[in-house]
């Protein structure tokens, strides 16, 4: 079993380049199934386990897929099958985004109920409601969602919650529907805009991505195209916090300020210096951090995917701060692990009360989900002694070479095989 070992106390300095966004690339890869002509070429694709998983799903569906360096090519011009089995979908709940493209392209979709990080229930009913509004017949049997439609017809769909996945799935299904589809109360994340841009490059007619209402005029067919994935705003935010908590000076290359304006506002409120430069965002950590309260919200609010990382900087701040989670239930599983490192935290309903500044102590901790994995490593950067983080399968779903990038900025961090190290002499690693 691999683990990451961090020796705290090093200031981070230098520059780090962001990769393509995980949350953007997965639906874009799924959308390549809509193209009945040509070969799609996707650039700036991150080397993540989730990308390999969705590529395997597409291969199973009979698409021709290759992934070399940071480029994915997909040819889906052959006869596409419509059955995405449990063995793939269980690894990653985002696999459900193939459902909209399959329904639009083949008239049917059979997709296993999804897996991924165990963060609350995250139901798929909003996706299915949209498909049904467009004329699909949907049923759930034996752990599979089955949807069929002789033809999809444009409809008006109101989302009870601005779900990112539902917005993407319904938007993709609507591209080949007959007539006009209007989706209200949609997600407004940058990844939605990136997907809409890709669809439009293929010949779709999607208007309003990034606003609360998206309108899609259905077309008869879509043609493959070339597209570069936007930079990962969550990876950028994670490294911004790493720089801030270590009192460092780091340029986050390719970070887009407009994509993380809520995080920038909160960090500046805490005393962190943020400078927008031509090729990214520079972060300069202060001597002391001020406590602030944070509430996660759908975009453009504070992103839930930055919640656990933000809690690290909150627990290092002077005074009491509150983190309130409004997007997902059961997303505080990492709190117990942080307490093992001497964090003063108390869960009260949908909030965590954090008292600081904590004097963090290195400990052996287990990642509970993707972002918690990164947060525990961040905590290790400022803890006294050695922090050992296990369950790296979560980290690899959303961060490529995370330890290597931290090393390049000056951190003492190593990724090791547990069976090949002497845990009584961790100093020998550095």
UniProtKB/Swiss-Prot annotation:
Documented EC number(s): 2.5.1.7
Gene3D superfamilies: Enolpyruvate transferase domain
Compartment annotation: Cytoplasm
Record keywords: Cell cycle, Cell division, Cell shape, Cell wall biogenesis/degradation, Cytoplasm, Peptidoglycan synthesis, Pyruvate, Transferase
UniProt-annotated binding residues for UDP-N-acetyl-alpha-D-glucosamine: 93, 122-126, 305, 327
Record: active site: 117 (proton donor)
Top class in the EC scheme: transferase
An example Gene Ontology CC term for this record: cytoplasm
Pathway linked to the protein: Cell wall biogenesis; peptidoglycan biosynthesis
Binding site for phosphoenolpyruvate: 22-23
Predominant subcellular localization, coarse grouping: cytoplasm
GO terms of biological process kind: cell division; cell wall organization; peptidoglycan biosynthetic process; regulation of cell shape; UDP-N-acetylgalactosamine biosynthetic process
InterPro entries, sorted: Enolpyruvate_Tfrase_dom, Enolpyruvate_Tfrase_sf, MurA_subfamily, RNA3'P_cycl/enolpyr_Trfase_a/b, UDP_GlcNAc_COvinyl_MurA
GO molecular function: UDP-N-acetylglucosamine 1-carboxyvinyltransferase activity
CDD domains assigned: UdpNAET
Catalytic activity: phosphoenolpyruvate + UDP-N-acetyl-alpha-D-glucosamine = UDP-N-acetyl-3-O-(1-carboxyvinyl)-alpha-D-glucosamine + phosphate
Domain of life assignment: Bacteria
Modified residues (2-(S-cysteinyl)pyruvic acid O-phosphothioketal): 117
Function of the molecule: Cell wall formation. Adds enolpyruvyl to UDP-N-acetylglucosamine.
PANTHER family given in the database record: UDP-N-ACETYLGLUCOSAMINE 1-CARBOXYVINYLTRANSFERASE
Family note: Belongs to the EPSP synthase family. MurA subfamily.
HAMAP family listed in its UniProt record: MurA (MF_00111)
Protein name stated in the entry: UDP-N-acetylglucosamine 1-carboxyvinyltransferase 1
Taxonomic source organism: Listeria monocytogenes serotype 4b (strain F2365)
């Amino acid at each position: 079993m691999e683990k990451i070992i961090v020796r705290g106390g090093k200031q981070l300095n230098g520059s780090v380049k962001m990769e393509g966004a995980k949350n953007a690339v997965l639906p874009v890869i799924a959308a390549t199934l809509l193209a009945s002509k040509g070969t799609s070429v996707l650039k700036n694709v991150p080397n993540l386990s989730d990308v390999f998983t969705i590529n395997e799903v597409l291969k199973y569906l009979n698409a021709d897929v290759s992934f070399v360096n940071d480029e994915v090519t997909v040819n889906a011009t052959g006869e596409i099958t419509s059955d995405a089995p449990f063995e793939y979908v269980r690894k990653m709940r985002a696999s459900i985004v193939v459902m909209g493209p399959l329904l639009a392209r083949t008239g049917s979709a059979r997709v296993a109920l999804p897996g991924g990080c165990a963060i609350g229930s995250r139901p798929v009913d909003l996706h299915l409601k949209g498909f049904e509004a467009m004329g699909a017949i949907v049923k759930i049997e034996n752990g599979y969602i089955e949807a069929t439609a002789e033809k999809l017809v444009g409809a008006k769909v109101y989302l009870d919650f601005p779900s990112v996945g539902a917005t993407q799935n319904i938007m993709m299904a609507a591209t080949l529907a007959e007539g006009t589809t209007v989706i209200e109360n949609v997600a407004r994340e940058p990844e939605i805009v990136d997907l809409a841009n890709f669809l439009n490059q293929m010949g779709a007619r999607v208007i309003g991505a990034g606003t609360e209402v998206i309108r899609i005029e259905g077309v008869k067919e879509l043609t493959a195209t070339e597209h570069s994935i936007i930079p990962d705003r969550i990876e950028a935010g994670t490294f911004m916090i790493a720089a801030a908590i270590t009192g460092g000076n780091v340029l986050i290359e390719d970070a887009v300020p407009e994509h993380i304006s809520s995080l920038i506002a909160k960090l500046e409120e805490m005393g962190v210096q943020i400078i927008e430069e031509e090729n990214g965002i520079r972060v300069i950590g202060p001597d002391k951090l001020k406590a602030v309260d944070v509430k996660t919200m759908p975009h453009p609010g504070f992103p839930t995917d930055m919640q656990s990382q933000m809690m690290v900087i909150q627990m290092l701040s002077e005074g009491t701060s509150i983190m309130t989670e409004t997007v997902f239930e059961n997303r505080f599983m990492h709190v117990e692990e942080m307490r093992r490192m001497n964090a003063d935290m108390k869960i009260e309903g949908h909030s965590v009360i954090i008292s600081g500044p904590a004097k963090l102590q290195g400990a052996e901790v287990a990642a509970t989900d993707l972002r918690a994995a990164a947060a525990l490593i961040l905590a290790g950067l400022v803890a006294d002694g050695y922090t050992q983080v296990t369950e790296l399968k979560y980290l690899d779903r959303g961060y490529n070479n995370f330890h290597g990038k931290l090393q390049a900025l000056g951190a003492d961090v190593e990724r090791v095989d547990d069976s090949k190290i002497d845990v009584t002499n961790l100093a020998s690693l550095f």
